[in-house]
C-alpha cells in the first residue's frame, strides 16, 4: 500500500489469534520444598539475613487450599471466616465459594490473625482498630494498614529469588503466587465439574485453563 502496489489492505478483518497465557504452576515437590523453606525462614528474626516475612507461608496455604488469587488473599477480612470454612470472595466474574476448614488452613488463618494483633497492639503504637469486621483485613502491613497487592507481589519475588539462590528450587521449578491457584484446582479431587465448583468458575472453559491434570481413562472394549 505504501508504494502503490496494493489498493486495499488484505489484512482488514483478520484478527490476531489469542495465545494461551503461560502458567507457572509448582510441581508438588517444589511446592512442598518452598512452603517448608518459607516456614523455616519466617522463624528467623525479622530483617535478619536470609529471613522472610512470616505471612508468606500462611498466604501460600490459603492461596492453594482456597484456590485464591493474590488480590483475593489480600482482601480477606474477618467476615470471611465462617464456622465451617472460608468464604472465598472471588474476582473476574467467578462465583463465591465456601471452602471447608482443614488443619493447615486453620493454622494459616490463626497465624495471620496473631501477626495482625501483634502489629495493631505493639507498644507505643496508637493504631485505631477498625470496628466493622469487613474493615479488619487479615493481611496487613507493618504500619497496620491493609497490605497492597503490589507489596505482596514484591515480597514474593524477593522470597522466590532467595529460594533459588539457596538451592531450594531450580530456575525451571520457579513458580508464581498465582500458580498456587492452578495447583489447588488441579489437585482438587473429582471430575471437571467438581473442580469447576471448587474454583467458582462460571464456564468449563475457564476451569480447563487451570486444571492441568492428565485424565486417566479406561481403554475401549472390543465388541
Question: What positions do the PLM features span?
Answer:
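Short basic/aromatic active-site micro-motif
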Residues: 53-56, 149-152, 169-189
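Conserved tyrosine-mediated DNA breakage-rejoining catalytic core shared by Y-recombinases
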Residues: 5, 13, 25, 71-130
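Basic, Lys/Arg- and aromatic-enriched nucleic-acid-binding interface segment
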Residues: 6, 13-70, 74
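Catalytic-site neighborhood detector that most strongly recognizes the C-terminal catalytic loop/helix
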Residues: 25, 90-94, 192, 199-223
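Active-site/catalytic core of tyrosine-dependent DNA strand-transfer enzymes
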Residues: 102-171, 184
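Phosphate-coordinating loops and pocket residues in cytosolic domains that bind phosphorylated ligands
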Residues: 16, 36, 75-76, 83, ...
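C-terminal catalytic core of tyrosine-transesterase DNA break-rejoin enzymes
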Residues: 61, 65, 71-72, 179-202
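Helix-turn-helix-type domain boundary/helix-start signal
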Residues: 4, 24-25, 99, 145, ...
Amino acid at each position: 500500500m505504501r508504494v502503490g502496489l496494493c489498493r486495499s489492505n488484505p489484512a482488514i478483518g483478520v484478527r490476531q489469534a489469542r495465545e494461551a497465557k503461560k502458567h507457572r504452576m509448582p510441581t508438588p515437590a517444589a511446592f512442598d520444598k518452598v512452603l517448608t523453606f518459607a516456614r523455616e525462614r519466617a522463624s528467623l528474626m525479622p530483617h535478619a539475613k536470609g529471613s522472610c516475612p512470616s505471612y508468606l507461608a500462611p498466604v501460600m496455604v490459603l492461596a492453594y487450599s482456597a484456590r485464591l488469587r493474590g488480590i483475593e488473599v489480600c482482601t480477606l477480612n474477618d467476615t470471611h471466616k465462617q464456622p465451617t470454612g472460608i468464604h472465598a470472595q472471588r474476582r473476574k466474574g467467578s462465583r463465591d465459594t465456601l471452602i471447608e476448614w482443614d488443619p493447615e488452613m486453620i493454622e494459616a488463618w490463626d497465624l495471620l490473625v496473631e501477626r495482625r494483633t501483634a502489629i495493631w497492639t505493639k507498644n507505643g503504637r496508637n493504631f485505631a482498630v477498625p470496628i466493622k469486621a469487613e474493615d479488619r483485613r487479615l493481611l496487613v502491613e507493618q504500619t497496620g494498614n491493609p497490605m497492597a497487592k503490589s507489596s505482596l507481589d514484591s515480597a514474593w519475588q524477593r522470597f522466590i529469588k532467595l529460594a533459588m539462590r539457596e538451592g531450594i528450587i531450580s530456575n525451571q521449578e520457579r513458580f508464581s503466587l498465582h500458580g498456587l491457584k492452578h495447583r489447588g484446582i488441579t489437585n482438587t479431587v473429582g471430575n471437571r465439574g467438581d473442580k469447576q465448583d471448587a474454583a467458582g468458575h462460571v464456564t468449563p472453559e475457564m476451569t480447563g485453563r487451570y486444571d492441568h491434570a492428565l485424565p486417566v481413562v479406561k481403554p475401549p472394549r472390543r465388541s
